[in-house]
Structures are given as C-alpha cells and as structure tokens.
Amino acid sequence: MKGRRRRRREYCKFTLLLALYTLLLLLVPSVLDSGSEQDKGGRDCPGLQRSLGVWSLEAAAAGEREQGAEVRFQAEGNPDRSPRPQGNLSAIRESVTQEKQHIYVHATWRTGSSFLGELFNQHPDVFYLYEPMWHLWQALYPGNAESLQGALRDMLRSLFRCDFSVLRLYAQPGDPAERAPDSANLTTAMLFRWRTNKVICSPPLCPAAPRARADVGLVEDKACESTCPPVPLRALEAECRKYPVVVIKDVRLLDLGVLVPLLRDPGLNLKVVQLFRDPRAVHNSRLKSRHGLLRESIQVLRTRQRGDRFQRVLLAHGVGARPGGQSRALPSAPRADFFLTSALEVICEAWLRDLLFTRGAPTWLRRRYLRLRYEDLVWQPQVQLRRLLRFSGLRTLAALDAFAFNMTRGSAYGADRPFHLSARDAREAVHAWRERLSQEQVRQVEAACDPAMRLLAYPRSGDERDVKTVRKGETPLETNANWAT
C-alpha cells in the first residue's frame, strides 16, 4: 500500500516536471525571437529622413491633429469667433498658443538674412539672437556641416528656452571681458554681433543707452560698445523670459527636416521662416566677401554627401587636414572661388531638399512654415513685412514699416563692408549679378541650381521671362508663395 502511494507521488512529480519542461520549451523560442527583434531594432534605427518621408507618425493621429489645427486657424482668422470645445487636447493647444512664440529664420549665407533678422530685432516685442550657432562652428572647425546638424538643433532647443548655458561649451578661452568679474559665468560680450542687439544695447541691460528699446533704428555698434558694459548671460536670460516672441536667425542649418522634433514639441510653439534668394545673386555676393566665407564653405564641403568628391581637393590644398597631418594656410583666389562655387552646389541641393520636404509636409507643419524670397522682400518691403508679422503673431508698427522701406531705398549696394548692415539700393542688390558675373559663372550656377530655381520661380538668364524681368527692372513675384507658406 505504501509502495503504491510512493509511486503515485513520484508519478505526479514526474508529470509536473514534464509539464514545466514542455512550457519552457515553448517559451524559449519566443524569448529569443523577441530579443533578436530588439537587437535588430537597435542596430537598424531608421534615419530621420526615412522616418519623416511618409509622415507616418502624423498620419496615425491625423484626424485629431487636423481638427485642432482647423480650430486654431479659424480662431486666428476671426478673433471674435469662439471655437467649438474639443476636449482636453484642445485645452492643451490653447494653453500652448498663449505661451511664447518661437521663430527660427532659416537661411544661408548672403541671402539678405541680416536684413530680415533686423526687422525682428527692431520690433519691441521680440527678443532676437543673431547667428548663435557661429560659436559651435568656430569651436568645432574644421568639422562636417552634416554631422553638426544635431548639435545645432539641440543648441536651438536650449536657446529658445532662454537657457544660454549651452554657450559655455563653445566659448573661446580668451578675452577676460567676456567673463563676469565675480564668477566664471560668460557675459554678453562673448555673443556674436552683440553690439547690434537691441535688447543688449538698450535699457534695462544698458541704462546709459541713447535709445529706448521701443525706438526703431539701427544700433551703432561702436556706440553700444562704449556705453553698454558687458553683463552676465544670466541677466540676458532673465530679459529673454520677458518677451512674448523669441527669434533666432542663423545660416548653418542645412536640413529643414532636422527641426521637425522641435516643431512637434507642443511646449516650444516653433515656427520657421525660410529665406531664399536668386542663387546667381548669392554667388555674386559670396565672391565679394570670399575671404570671410572661406572657412564656412569648407565646413559645407566636408559633408558626407560630397565628402568623397571634395575631400581629396581639400587635403591636396592642406585645408582641414586630418588630425596629425600638416595643414597650410587657406587658399587664395582662384582656388577660393572654387570652394565657394562648390559650396553653393551643396547649398542648392539643400534648398531643393527643403522645398520638396515642405511640399510633402502635413497641413499642421505647413501652417508653421513661411517661405519668403529676398527679391519679394526688397521690392515690396511693407507688404512682405505685414505678411511676416501676421505669421509671427506680432503687431504692426508704422515706424517699422518706414524702417523696412528706407532700408531698401538706399543710395548704394554697400560693397565696401559686405558684412555691415545698412540701407541698400534694392534694384542694385537684385540685379548686380548680371553685370559682375561672367557668362561662365552664370552658366555654372544655373546648371547646379536649376531644379531649386524652377521651384522658386527664378527664370534662367536669356529666356522670355528673364528678358521681361530685365526690361521691367524687377523680379516677378512668386505666384505660389501664400501657402502658409
């Protein structure tokens, strides 16, 4: 009897072990498959361009996003009309729109972006920064423009939140005036072009300034330097937080798609103004200021897209040599002209990529994007200024209207100081390339930039539209520039 009970217990144990073993055999392949998929996902992370190309993340929530965007659009178009309640999501969006507005002016070198940025700098409701990413490019030279795009985006995120501590990472160890006397904190003197910043060069940061912040007019850099002692960046951060609109202008971001994570951030409330200019006029202006743009052009040429083609050229001239290698001085013309021309090819490719990118963008993103041509801005400064202010949520000012008009009706093109902002002759600025570029130079630019030129409605030299343009003395306005655009 006892033997029978013992055998029964052993049989039950054996059955239980067999069941557990079978279950384990079933679970092991599933666990292994799950682990391999995770490893594969970690090794094969989709790139930004592939992730954004079909806008799949937006499509998943298209209905609710588009509905909220429509409500916001209707409210902006008719302030007296109360939008229909849309639940918690609508409340979140409403709170975001009441927060700060952030604007990024997306441009490239010699497109007139300093003038466009100055319109924001003059507005009393705007806190404006001029090319803060200059510090990053200088600190990491000779770098790769493409590989620096992520760092530029992260810097933008911090600066838009009025956190300037990121600038310490790229500060040059030099002038003691750039540091506060009581600490290691940086001061406003380290900022690129700080002497023309309206916030830095007016009260309360500069009590002795001759102009109030609300007065519209260019800041004299020498006068600001003599009357406005540097203040810690913490004080500038405090001023930044007071303004309803923060605008940053820069020329070193080559891919609009890099900004999509910031545009998606509901707490950032970011919009982008992208400025274009006739590539032939850009090339003419770049040649005039070739020595000031040579380092920047080399950074552009070191991108992976053209690395194989141009790396041998750069190394042959000893420019941007690999660590440990011998590096010579920057080349002089005509080799400098070659670098500038080649960099323009990369820039035109970036323009084309951005134009196609925005064409396939969802409605919510297109409403946060404004496309503007320099030629339209200087021929119709007041019309384009009102369009710009409406997009940015800023009030119109008669003094700013007059400022924009007078800045485009100067007496000269300003060739003596190409990096100095002053009133220019709009006609001369638009058409100077026709007299200063050779036929071969024009042909090279048009060959490299033709796809982008066609999308931006710039006629090739010699065709029927171009002949009419020369006869009338102005560039035809872009006909499809009003998709919010």
Curated annotation (Swiss-Prot):
One annotated Gene Ontology cellular component of this protein: Golgi apparatus
Modification type Phosphoserine: residues: 461
Positions annotated with a glycan in the UniProt record: 88, 185, 406
Residue ranges of the region described as Disordered: 66-88, 465-485
Membrane topology: Single-pass type II membrane protein
UniProt enzyme class: transferase
GO molecular function: chondroitin 6-sulfotransferase activity; N-acetylglucosamine 6-O-sulfotransferase activity
Transmembrane segments: 13-33
Binding residues annotated for 3'-phosphoadenylyl sulfate, in chain numbering: 109-115, 277-285
Biased composition (Basic and acidic residues): 465-475
Functional description taken from the UniProt entry: Sulfotransferase that utilizes 3'-phospho-5'-adenylyl sulfate (PAPS) as sulfonate donor to catalyze the transfer of sulfate to position 6 of non-reducing N-acetylglucosamine (GlcNAc) residues. Preferentially acts on mannose-linked GlcNAc. Also able to catalyze the transfer of sulfate to position 6 of the N-acetylgalactosamine (GalNAc) residue of chondroitin. Also acts on core 2 mucin-type oligosaccharide and N-acetyllactosamine oligomer with a lower efficiency. Has weak or no activity toward keratan sulfate and oligosaccharides containing the Galbeta1-4GlcNAc.
Family according to the record: Belongs to the sulfotransferase 1 family. Gal/GlcNAc/GalNAc subfamily.
Protein name: Carbohydrate sulfotransferase 7
Source organism (scientific name): Rattus norvegicus
